[in-house]
């Protein structure tokens, strides 16, 4: 199996439709041992989701912005496993005044809060668990991303934070590679998750993907994204670090929208030329 015997810490499981939940479930199917983390009021929800996995997973409390809790999680994992083979970073938060077309009005405190939780936390988690990762086998950190190469409507400081996340990923790759630890991101297309429901303008983004993705895009299926995460968490990706793997049906590769009917007209033209 792809992840046989690997020990993984997975953050961000809040519903059984979340990408993180699908990663945890698929990881167990591929032979991994999994521990989840939860925080605040969401901790109880994460514990409920842990019971729905193939094998119930333990849940550790973790506020990723609290150094004491990071240290406590590291201690628990050290006692339990003694090493760590992989981490899924599925953590993001943006205050309400940092999204929804309020980019110019967002106060610095909200921008900083978005950066700290959505981006800096990747570094914080990696640094806190590095001694365990160094003892792991081809250890891998995977973070969930949304393409930050362009400005999306209403995404605002979430987009800025994702851009920071992508930069942090590159610096982690630089600094952790010599210590045998990889760091990569998976830039997913939009999915109907709890996180997406909090994004004003999500329906517009969803329509872009449904209309333009060359491979098509199923808003209700996190499995392709989860499987990409499993690949990066596995030894098969042992020579890959600092990468952003787009799992979005190909939308990131398009320079402009394809007009409705253009693809079918082009195909019809090719057929006519072939016939002649």
Place the predicted regions along the sequence by residue.
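Canonical Rossmann dinucleotide-binding motif of NAD(H)/NADP(H)-dependent dehydrogenases/reductases
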Residues: 2-36
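Hydrophobic structural elements of the Rossmann-like NAD(P)H-binding subdomain
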Residues: 10, 88, 142, 183-186, ...
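Catalytic loop of short-chain dehydrogenase/reductase
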Residues: 12-21, 92-130, 134-178, 190-193, ...
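A short hydrophobic alpha-helix cap/turn motif
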Residues: 28, 82, 134-135, 174-179, ...
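Conserved mid-core segment of classical short-chain dehydrogenase/reductases
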Residues: 51, 60-71, 75-80, 86-114, ...
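Short-chain dehydrogenase/reductase
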Residues: 74, 122, 126, 169-170, ...
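C-terminal helical subdomain
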Residues: 120, 185, 203-240, 245-249, ...
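Short C-terminal tail/terminal secondary-structure segment
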Residues: 241-276
């Amino acid at each position: 199996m792809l992840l046989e015997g690997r020990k993984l810490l997975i953050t961000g499981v809040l519903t059984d439709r979340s990408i993180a939940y699908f990663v945890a479930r698929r990881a167990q199917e591929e032979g991994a041992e999994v521990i989840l983390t939860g925080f605040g009021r969401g901790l109880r929800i994460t514990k409920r989701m842990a019971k729905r996995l193939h094998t119930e997973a333990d849940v550790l409390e973790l506020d990723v912005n609290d150094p004491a809790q990071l240290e406590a999680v590291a201690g628990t994992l050290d006692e339990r496993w003694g090493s760590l083979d992989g981490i899924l970073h599925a953590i993001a938060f943006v205050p309400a005044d940092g999204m929804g077309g309020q980019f110019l009005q967002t106060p610095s405190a909200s921008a900083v809060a978005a950066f700290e939780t959505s981006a800096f936390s990747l570094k914080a988690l990696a640094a806190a668990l590095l001694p365990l990762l160094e003892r792991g086998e081809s250890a891998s950190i995977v973070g969930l991303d949304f393409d930050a190469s362009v400005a999306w409507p209403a995404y605002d400081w979430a987009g800025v934070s994702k851009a920071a996340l992508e930069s942090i990923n590159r610096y982690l790759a630089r600094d952790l590679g010599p210590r045998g630890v990889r760091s990569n991101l998976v830039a997913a297309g939009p999915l109907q998750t709890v996180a997406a429901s909090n994004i004003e303008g999500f329906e517009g983004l969803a329509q872009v993907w449904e209309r333009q993705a060359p491979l098509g895009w199923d808003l209700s299926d996190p499995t392709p994204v989860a499987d990409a995460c499993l690949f990066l968490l596995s030894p098969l990706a042992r020579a890959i670090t600092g990468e952003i793997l787009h799992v979005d049906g190909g939308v990131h590769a398009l320079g402009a929208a394809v007009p409705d009917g253009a693809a079918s007209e082009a195909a019809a033209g090719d057929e006519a030329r072939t016939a002649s």
